[in-house]
Every structure is written in C-alpha cells, then in structure tokens.
C-alpha cells in the first residue's frame, strides 16, 4: 500500500531536495546571478571565475556575443554593440530620441511606438536585447547549480513604472525564465543586510547604479521589511559621471561635440577608466588620441557635485515622505558600483550623520538579496522562518472624474500588493456607458498627471443621473503591475483592463511629477475646488434647463420663469471666470430659487401616478 505524500503548501514534498531558484540583478552597466549554496547567498561565476557580466550585447552576422567581449567591441562596432539597454526598457521611440547623442544607435519605429535598434541581424527591441543577457545568466546558473531552474527573482529600480516592469517580465519570458517575482532593488539590498546582520530599525538604501538612482526608507522589524517611502531619479547614475568626464575631455582637447559613434564609445571608455582610477587616486593621467591631460579628484568632484546634490534632495524628500526625521535613520546601505566614488560616500554620510554600510560588495548586494527571496519563493524553507517584504507604489493611482479632476484611489507609498475600491455614479440621465480613464500622478488635474489606460463600461441600465452605482477596483500585484475593474452593482455588468502601457515615463519625469506636486500644492488645491464648483454648477444648470423644457410652461408663471432664467444667466457668466466662491454662492441661489419648481414637479408626478387608482389598488 502506497503512503500518501504530504507537504506544506508551497514547499517541496521532499525537503532534502532543494528547488533551484536564483536572484538576478539585471543592471544598466553590469548584471549578476546569485543563488543560495550551502546556506549562503553568493553570486555565481562563469567558467573564467567572473561573477559580473557586463550588460552588453553585440549582434554579429552569424551569432550573438554577450558580456565583456561585446563591451570591448563597442568602440569599433558601435551600431551593433548595445550597452545600457536598461535605459530603453518600456520606453517609446519619442522618449528614446530625447536621449540624443548618449545613444549612438540607429533607431527604427515598431509596433506600439516601441523603439527598435537597427543591427546587422535586423531590428532588435530592448526586450530582445535584455533577453539575450538573461539567457546567458540562466545558462550560467544551470551549469553551476547542475539542474533546471524553477524560477528567478529579478530586481528592478523602485521607480520603474508599469511599462518598464512589464518589459522586464517579457524579457525574462523570452529568455525561458519563470519570474517568481520582480523585486525592487533597494528592497533586495535590505534583504541581504537584514539577514546577515539581523538589523532592526529604520534603514536608508542609497542605490546609485549605472543608469538609475533610487533611495528607499525601510523599517526593519522582526523579519518584516516595510518600505516607508521611495524616491529617486530614472536618469541619474554612473553613466552620467562618465558623460561629465567625456565632456571635460572634449573641451580640454578641443574636440568637436559632433563625434561619430566609434569615437563616442572610445571616449566613454576612457572616461569610465578615469572615474574608476580616481576612487583610489588623487589624480589620473587621461589620454585620448594625441591629447593627454591630468584629471584631479577635486575637478571630477566639482563636475559631479550637481548630480550628487540631486540625489541628496531626493533623499530628503523620501525621509519627509516616510514621516520620520533624518536622525531616526539607524543605518545607510550603499548599493551600486557608483557608490564607490569617495565624494558620494562622503556626501551621503554627511547628510545622514553616520558612516554608510559597505560590508557587502555594492555591485553584488542586490543579487544576493534577490537570491535569498528566490529561495523562499521556490518553496525551500530557511532557518529563521519566512521573510515578509512590503514594497510600495511610487506614484498615486486614480481615475478621471467630471471636470478633468484626478481622483486618487491608491495613494503613493501604499504597501503592495493592494486592492482598493471606490464607488462612482453617472453624470447624466439615461447614461448607459462610462469611460474609465486610469491615471498616475500627484497633481489634482488630469492634464498634470500621466494617462495609463482607458476602457469603457457599457450596458449600464437607464437611470436618472446619480442613481447608478459603479464600483471601480484598483489592484496592484506584488510585481507592481496594475489591473482595474469596473462593475455596475445593480445589473452586474463589468469591464476590466490590465494596465500595460506601450511606453514608460521619460527621463526624470517621475522626479519632476513629485517635485511639481509639492511646488504647486496650493495652486492645485484652488484649481480643484474651482473645477468642483464648476461641475456642480454645470450639473445644476443642465438639470434646471431640462426641467424648464419639460414643465416650465405648465408649472411656472412668467415672472417665475424670468427669475430662474436670470439666476441661470448669472451662473453661466460666473462660469467663465475663476472665482470658485462666487460660483458656489450663485449655485446655491439658483438651487433656492428653483426649490418651489422642484416641489411642484414632484407633486405633479405623484398625482399623475395616482390618477384613476383607488385606495385598495395603492395599498396593494
């Protein structure tokens, strides 16, 4: 008789057999894959012992080269050697063109305005390029671990929007990887340090990589990692340091700013080498072609000081959003290769009043944390129990209401996964459909927010305005992807959409949106109040006009009609202005002057309904 095999839900039925899962840091400059081995999370090396894989892909006529060889070939073959592709993930062709000379590629348009890079193998999308990097990491992991992977946790910047996250998942799928979860990079770093040092309290994760900057404020308590607030800049990183040095070389050497792609690549490689050398040296000799000069650490720090200031400003904002004081931050974790720059560490330490933590390699810490989470999600139970991660959404999500107003359904910094619902109603009598316009942002008017998607709810039963009840539910999953559903409660008609925008935010747009929301808070509040008063007034004017057309001649005297018409015109005149208080007062006056008319209409309706019926019929 066979025994029934029993296992904990989500756990392996054979505890001694580990399910192979990895953490992947898909970075702008470099990528890594890590896994738990002998109880310790560590990056996995390639056959030559290198753990870091340059995020570079070169397309050849008869093959694909990924990693160091592709990066080294970039100066001689810039059009087919794709670097920093992470900056293109989830972006539109128009967004990519704004990056200009920073991207020496030939771009062609594709479906849904997605940018394709023209290579010797034909057009390649950023998703395909990223997939080629992930394929190498997957193969490395399976070769090292000796088996097939059940899945991977892939890290993304906390500020990646829906389009960028979806593009990352699409790349993983194309690479043959099962995505267990997308994990914010700062949260992954917290996982690594929290387990290694059993830290509790408030921690700041300062993540300055090759192409993006993220700051996260987390509270660590008894194995729970809660992200209190996030901030950052999608267009700030070590690449920008390189471009600053490259600009200095162009100026010092008297070069033309209009360089061919090969020269651009060579110049950026020279700049990157100088930046890395200045980590340990006070000065470095720089040579480009026939020109040679000396770059001091002080001069380099002066170049990047505005960029560092931008990062510190984002840190202060994140601390404010988290509702704590700078002094409450008990530890600062440095993540990303660009945090090796001495001036960066010095500035961050000065801001938070403590020496930043760098005991885990800043290039490896994200992958190490992702591997720990992957091992848990794969069903391998670890000592110390489960780990709970509470990420947050970076920008508020909501929908458009009458008057072009943004109604926030899920506020920014809400812990995910999350589901929130609100009820709305119809604006006009007999309205049978409703357009649901999903938005992202912090401002009060939809013109100042980002449109994510639109869909229609049809089949709403004919009712008077305000009678229908439409419940709109927003749901954000653990990967930060949004789905929206609308349901009319009386009839049960329903419509939904999964938000997968065809392109992401432009460089710095998220940071700009947050900045604008703070700077324009007062004006936005006034604008919202004005639009609300205007909508109320327009609704009343429409209702009164409809009543006059139907029953005005029958139920009102000439003087009464004139009085109502006068108040209506007064209100229409005010609607062309910006005095919200005056509009509100005139709306009240029009409502008061039509009260008697409304009562007569009600009486008339009741009499008509009762005409020809006796008491017994009514009681029945």
Swiss-Prot record:
Domain of life: Bacteria
InterPro entries (alphabetical): ATPase_NBD, Heat_shock_70_CS, HscA_NBD, HSP70_C_sf, HSP70_peptide-bd_sf, Hsp_70_fam, ISC_FeS_clus_asmbl_HscA
PROSITE patterns (UniProt xref): HSP70_1, HSP70_2, HSP70_3
Molecular function via GO: ATP binding; ATP hydrolysis activity; ATP-dependent protein folding chaperone; unfolded protein binding
BP-aspect Gene Ontology terms: iron-sulfur cluster assembly
Pfam family membership, one: HSP70
Keywords: ATP-binding, Chaperone, Nucleotide-binding, Stress response
Keyword ATP-binding in annotation: yes
Described purpose of this protein according to its UniProt entry: Chaperone involved in the maturation of iron-sulfur cluster-containing proteins. Has a low intrinsic ATPase activity which is markedly stimulated by HscB.
Sequence similarity: Belongs to the heat shock protein 70 family.
Name of this protein: Chaperone protein HscA homolog
């Amino acid at each position: 008789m066979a025994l029934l095999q029993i296992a904990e839900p989500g756990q392996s039925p054979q505890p001694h057999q580990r399910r192979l899962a990895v953490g992947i840091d898909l970075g702008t400059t470099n990528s890594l894959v890590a896994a738990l081995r002998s109880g310790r999370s560590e990056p996995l090396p390639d056959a030559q012992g290198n753990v870091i894989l340059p995020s570079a892909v070169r397309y050849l006529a008869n093959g694909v080269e990924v990693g160091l060889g592709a990066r080294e070939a970039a100066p001689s073959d810039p059009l087919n050697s794709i670097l920093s592709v992470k900056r293109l993930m989830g972006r539109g062709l128009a967004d990519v063109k704004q990056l200009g000379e920073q991207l020496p590629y030939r771009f062609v348009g594709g479906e849904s305005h997605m940018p394709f890079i023209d290579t010797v193998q034909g057009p390649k999308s950023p998703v395909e390029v990223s997939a080629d990097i992930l394929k190498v990491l997957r193969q490395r992991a399976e070769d090292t671990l000796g088996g097939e992977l059940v899945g991977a946790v892939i890290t993304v910047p906390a500020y990646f929007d829906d389009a960028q996250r979806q593009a990352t998942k699409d790349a993983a799928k194309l690479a043959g990887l099962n995505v267990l979860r997308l994990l914010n990079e700062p949260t992954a770093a917290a996982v690594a340090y929290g387990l290694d040092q059993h830290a509790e309290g408030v921690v700041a994760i300062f993540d300055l990589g090759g192409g993006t900057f993220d700051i996260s404020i987390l509270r660590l308590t008894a194995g729970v990692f809660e992200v209190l607030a996030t901030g950052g800049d999608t267009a700030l990183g070590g690449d920008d340091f390189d471009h600053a040095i490259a600009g200095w070389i162009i100026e010092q050497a008297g070069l033309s700013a209009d360089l061919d792609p090969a020269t651009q690549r060579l110049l950026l490689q020279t700049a990157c080498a100088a930046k890395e050398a200045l980590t340990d040296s006070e000065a470095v000799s720089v040579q480009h072609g026939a020109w040679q000069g000396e770059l001091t650490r002080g001069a380099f720090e002066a170049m990047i000081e505005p960029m560092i200031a931008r990062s510190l400003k984002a840190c202060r904002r994140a601390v404010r959003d988290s509702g704590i004081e700078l002094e409450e931050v008990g530890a600062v974790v440095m993540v990303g290769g660009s945090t090796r720059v001495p001036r960066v560490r010095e500035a961050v330490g000065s801001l938070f009043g403590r020496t930043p933590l760098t005991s885990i390699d800043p290039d490896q810490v994200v992958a190490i944390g992702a591997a720990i989470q992957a091992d848990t999600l794969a069903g391998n139970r670890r000592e110390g129990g489960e780990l709970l991660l509470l990420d947050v959404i970076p920008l508020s999500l909501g929908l458009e209401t009458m008057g072009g107003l943004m109604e926030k359904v899920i506020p920014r910094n809400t812990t995910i996964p999350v589901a929130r619902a609100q009820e709305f109603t119809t604006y006009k009598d007999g309205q049978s459909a409703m357009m649901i316009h999903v938005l992202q942002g912090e401002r009060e008017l939809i013109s100042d927010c980002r449109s994510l998607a639109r869909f229609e709810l049809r089949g709403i039963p004919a009712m008077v305005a305000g009678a229908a009840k439409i419940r709109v539910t927003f749901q954000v999953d653990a990967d930060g992807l949004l789905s929206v559903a609308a349901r009319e409660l009386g009839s049960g008609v329903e419509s939904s959409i999964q938000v997968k925008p065809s392109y992401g935010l432009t460089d710095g747009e998220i940071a700009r949106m947050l900045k604008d929301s703070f700077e324009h808070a007062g004006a936005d509040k006034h604008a919202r109040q004005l639009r609300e008063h205007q909508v109320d007034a327009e609704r009343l004017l429409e209702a009164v006009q409809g009543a006059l057309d139907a029953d005005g001649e029958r139920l009102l005297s000439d003087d009464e009609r004139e009085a109502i018409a006068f108040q209506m015109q007064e209100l229409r005149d005010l609607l062309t202005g910006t005095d919200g208080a005056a509009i509100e007062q005139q709306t009240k006056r029009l409502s008061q002057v039509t009260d008697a008319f409304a009562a007569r209409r009600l009486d008339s309706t009741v009499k008509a309904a009762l005409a020809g019926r006796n008491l017994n019929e009514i009681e029945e």
